[in-house]
From Swiss-Prot:
It comes from the Bacteria. This is Uridylate kinase. Inhibited by UTP. Homohexamer.
Amino acid sequence: MAEPVYRRVVVKLSGEYLAGPHSFGIDQPTVDRIADDLIAVQKLGIEIAVVVGGGNMVRGVEVSSQGVSRATGDTMGMLATVMNSLALEAALQRKGAPAVALSAFVMPQVCELFTRAAAHRALAEGRIVVLGGGTGNPYFTTDTTAVLRAAEIGAQAVLKATNVDGVYSADPKKDPAAKRFDRLTHSQAIEGGYKVMDATAFALARETSLPIIVFSIAEPGAIGAMLRGEGRGTIVAG
């Protein structure tokens, strides 16, 4: 078995993926499978923080299109990510894994507040850190949150888990001629307008010299495979 490429990473999970085969809510078998994957990665000696999206509950942009202000819609979406983080924390703990949910919002009755010190301490204690609440500010995506938190906690890479095995020149589900890239620079990802992450996330990763690895999480063990350098995906770096 190959040695892990990185020792501390941030994994970005979409809220939509947590819904599993459903269009809304949390699919427990899917959450349990992700928890198993994260536990297996931790056993490789890798420190893991996970940023979860909220699209299975609320998407701020969609809510704002229905008359709610964008700032309010985004706040609703960020609160949805807290619910998802609690679901993942519970699944990990139920399987015997040390895990803690940290929120960008102050909600002491629900979970701990994210601070750099709290995250560093939890990782040093061997806990899987699940990050909810986005950045705590509207207008920023959870992709940008993942890069921001990675920079804050000194992670070596961001793993963007998606439903496709990398970055393509076009949507491979719609265009059979779409080309998959093995590697892109941050600037190429921004200039290409690839929709796998937003430009702000790529720009922050470029500024902080953080590689982003885009891969499919569809198969069990995909996160570990990518971290051992054995998986199929796109590396965005440089």
